[in-house]
Amino acid sequence: MKGSYKIIVQNSNVRYEFEIRRNITIIKGDSATGKTTLVEMIGEFYENGTSSGIELFCEKTCSVLSGRNWKAALDTMKEEIIFIDEGNAFVYSTEFARAVQESDNYYVIVTREGLVNLPYSVEEIYGIRESGKYAALKQTYNELYHIYGEIDFHEKIKPEKVIVEDSNSGFEFFKGIAEKEECVVISANGKSNIFEKVLQSTGEEKVLVIADGAAFGSEMIVWSSF
């Protein structure tokens, strides 16, 4: 599967409308924000269709994966958008990560923890919030929002230290640039080591971190507590 897919799921009380853009989407947030309700509605429609009182609009099949038999169930799912609620421990396993990489499905995973085995983007971590778009209706409208937004820099960045994720061509490239500016460049030798390298810096240093945001999502739970 490639591309983005719009999903609308609703009943007489609540409506969710959002777009899935990549193969792994993470939904985070506190209790009572509508995460489990969303997954339950997807599952109810998948099992019972419109007789459930739920309407779902998407060009791809939306389904729910859960329980100890997840692998057998996943083997039968092809080109689907698969929702996984909190409490399914298999999402943390290397076996699940391998199955995701080998499949042609999209995955929407509800979790409050980082999934270190999965390469998901910082830009595909969302929360759920109520929107005033349908404020005149009794139906509550919910939408997804980016938890980690983009920051536009309007001033020149002048770091004293640059921490680069890799130790190969990326490191050599930025080292060559930074040496002209009398700036120290070090390699973290992997995304999981970046946070430790930042902690080793003095509090007065201006530090710039260069990492692949498309695979850095699982590390954000550490950074959000920093």
Predicted regions and their residues:
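Post-Walker A alpha-helix
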Residues: L38-E40
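Structural recognition of the conserved hydrophobic beta-strand(s) that form the central parallel beta-sheet
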Residues: F83-D85, D104-G114
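Conserved P-loop NTPase "ATPase switch" module shared by AAA+ and STAND
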Residues: R68-T94
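Conserved lysine of the Walker
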Residues: K35
